[in-house]
Amino acid sequence: MTRAPAIDPSERYVLLTTFCRDGSPVATPVWFAPLPDDPDTLAMITDREAGKVKRLRHTSRCTLAPCDVRGRPHGDAVEAEGRVADDPGEVAAATAALAGRYGWQWRLLGFGARLRGRDPAASRAVLLVRPTAPT
């Protein structure tokens, strides 16, 4: 029996909620792509200095919910565990999955970074988030 994914892969955005040290939630809409070798793990990309990177480094607990581009959820949130990918192979797989999923939008994002004098690959962090099994 095949298990349905926690987040519908046809969604364009997911609301990633990370938690501050004091436990307060911070929600952000982000692009995501399932990893080809592990479709339960979702890859996301953000600026290396973003707050969500810092928050995931100190606590892996997060939640995911389908949402629109403005972060308005339209489905239930699921508990998840997230981490910042440091392995070059994981970063390459995540980057390829996101580039394949978002196509011209992905290329435009890189072009915009280069216009601002930034190396897109050096200025971003890859997040890997996996919904936790319901208990």
Feature-to-residue mapping (PLM):
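Short, structured beta-strand-loop surface elements
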Residues: 49-114, 123-128
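Short, small/hydrophobic-residue-rich motifs at membrane-helix boundaries and re-entrant hairpins
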Residues: 1-3, 127-132
